């Protein structure tokens, strides 16, 4: 049983209404000490006043009552709706603390929800992602995780691994019992291969989704005065970078963010690449190549009738494992468009960049965002990959002739990685599985 906590749920600012949340076994008792209205039935709202220690009215409020475990935190909870002034809201909060509540820590209500098994880590992360979503698309994707579909799939993988571990342990420790499945290489290997395939499919559909969800990184590169800064300004729809006819004005990397079709992009405008004697400008060129390394998409800007130089070739080489797009600026000066069919044509002067925007959008929409099995959390995806690698080790071991009692170490690692997505791995689960599924107590 936890102590009773309280906090302002709506932020400490002036607004029409503020909400103060209280959770814990003594929630009703503490609120009753300062509230003149009735204690309502579960999931009802009552009206009354909040009184201070001198029994003077602090505010008139509505109070929502949540009794028992069928609520967000899984314990008695109360929500007080008061007027949204900073002073009055904090007065109510201080009265709750003075009468026995403790000021909640950051995320403590959600932590209690998790500890009381009202949600798992997948949903907890989805809620946090929804709160911090920077785009409508991110918000929609986060909400898709609320139905628990991916949690149910991962739970089935966990159950399968748990069964295999428990059965292997039973074969080792209790070989005399013939009511337990006898796992050997021929029976264990197909089960391992099936799980590996499922995890591999999950990784494939999720890797790109994870990168896109968290924001694709774009680098704008090219010679001086080809329109790099103008393209940055056009994509941002604001004058973020200074545009002049003088070469070498961009010496440091300029970074900004923008959206296309609800997807987030972070973009870097880099120094123009040319032979220089100036140490400062040379440092800017070094930073350009560092930015290419860190980026997902490279926009290589060129102009009509310009010959390639060594820097252009270096850009292509360093962009080998990236999404590389050659952008032809000043398309209004192009006489023969057929010669540049492989390029994306834009005009930064006229802010005509629709072809480029459509191309960037197509990369994002190539993912099935409605697929409930998508994992976009880097943390969750890393756990899936660890499980996949551990099972691959187990598979190789079985194929090379190792017995189940040896590869069980890798199978257990795979299980622990998946359980860490749902919550903390607990070896008691293994014991529970062994003694609940098999007749070992006789």
Swiss-Prot record:
Pfam families: MMR_HSR1, MnmE_helical, TrmE_N. The keyword Kinase does not apply. One of its GO terms (biological process) is tRNA wobble uridine modification. (6S)-5-formyl-5,6,7,8-tetrahydrofolate binds at residues 21, 79, 118, 442. Transmembrane segments: none annotated. InterPro entries: G_TrmE (IPR031168), GTP-bd (IPR006073), GTP-bd_TrmE_N (IPR018948), GTPase_MnmE (IPR004520), MnmE_dom2 (IPR027368), MnmE_helical (IPR025867), P-loop_NTPase (IPR027417), Small_GTP-bd (IPR005225). The keyword Ubl conjugation does not apply. Its EC number is 3.6.-.-. PROSITE patterns: G_TRME. Binds 1 potassium ion per subunit. Gene3D superfamilies: P-loop containing nucleotide triphosphate hydrolases, Probable tRNA modification gtpase trme, domain 1, tRNA modification GTPase MnmE domain 2. Residues 215-365 form the TrmE-type G domain. GTP binds at residues 225-230, 244-250, 269-272. Keywords: Cytoplasm, GTP-binding, Hydrolase, Magnesium, Metal-binding, Nucleotide-binding, Potassium, tRNA processing. GO terms for cellular component: cytosol. Mg(2+) binds at residues 229, 250. It is found in: Cytoplasm. GO terms for molecular function: GTP binding; GTPase activity; metal ion binding. Its cofactor is K(+). Exhibits a very high intrinsic GTPase hydrolysis rate. Involved in the addition of a carboxymethylaminomethyl (cmnm) group at the wobble position (U34) of certain tRNAs, forming tRNA-cmnm(5)s(2)U34. Homodimer. Heterotetramer of two MnmE and two MnmG subunits. Belongs to the TRAFAC class TrmE-Era-EngA-EngB-Septin-like GTPase superfamily. TrmE GTPase family. This is tRNA modification GTPase MnmE. It comes from Mycoplasma mobile (strain ATCC 43663 / 163K / NCTC 11711). The lineage of its organism: Bacteria, Bacillati, Mycoplasmatota, Mycoplasmoidales, Metamycoplasmataceae. The gene is mnmE.
